[in-house]
Amino acid sequence: MNPLIASASVLAAALAIGLASLGPGLAQGNASGQALEGIARQPEAEGKIRGTLLLSLAFMESLTIYGLVIALVLLFANPFAS
């Protein structure tokens, strides 16, 4: 494999997982804070808020998993390597 392609693949994999985890990480923190604030304001709606929060967190985490899959493809099944 060309060393330039290998270096670029490692750099792209690092950027893919880093950037793919940055957005969902910030969004998960924000969503959790807002959910706790909502539960503090309306304790009787705790179950509904918690269910919605967990579903939202799962969708946000899927974006990070897609970044991980792209990084693994670039590292181990590189389509640009001959």
Curated annotation (Swiss-Prot):
The chain crosses the membrane at residues 3-23, 57-77. The record marks E61 as: Reversibly protonated during proton transport. One of its GO terms (molecular function) is proton-transporting ATP synthase activity, rotational mechanism. InterPro entries: ATP_synth_csu_bac/chlpt, ATP_synth_F0_csu, ATP_synth_F0_csu_DDCD_BS, ATP_synth_F0_csu_sf, ATPase_proteolipid_c-like_dom, F/V-ATP_Csub_sf. Its main location: membrane. It is a multi-pass membrane protein. It is found in: Cellular thylakoid membrane. Belongs to the ATPase C chain family. F-type ATPases have 2 components, F(1) - the catalytic core - and F(0) - the membrane proton channel. F(1) has five subunits: alpha(3), beta(3), gamma(1), delta(1), epsilon(1). F(0) has four main subunits: a(1), b(1), b'(1) and c(10-14). The alpha and beta chains form an alternating ring which encloses part of the gamma chain. F(1) is attached to F(0) by a central stalk formed by the gamma and epsilon chains, while a peripheral stalk is formed by the delta, b and b' chains. F(1)F(0) ATP synthase produces ATP from ADP in the presence of a proton or sodium gradient. F-type ATPases consist of two structural domains, F(1) containing the extramembraneous catalytic core and F(0) containing the membrane proton channel, linked together by a central stalk and a peripheral stalk. During catalysis, ATP synthesis in the catalytic domain of F(1) is coupled via a rotary mechanism of the central stalk subunits to proton translocation. Key component of the F(0) channel; it plays a direct role in translocation across the membrane. A homomeric c-ring of between 10-14 subunits forms the central stalk rotor element with the F(1) delta and epsilon subunits. This is ATP synthase subunit c. It comes from Thermosynechococcus vestitus (strain NIES-2133 / IAM M-273 / BP-1). The gene is atpE.
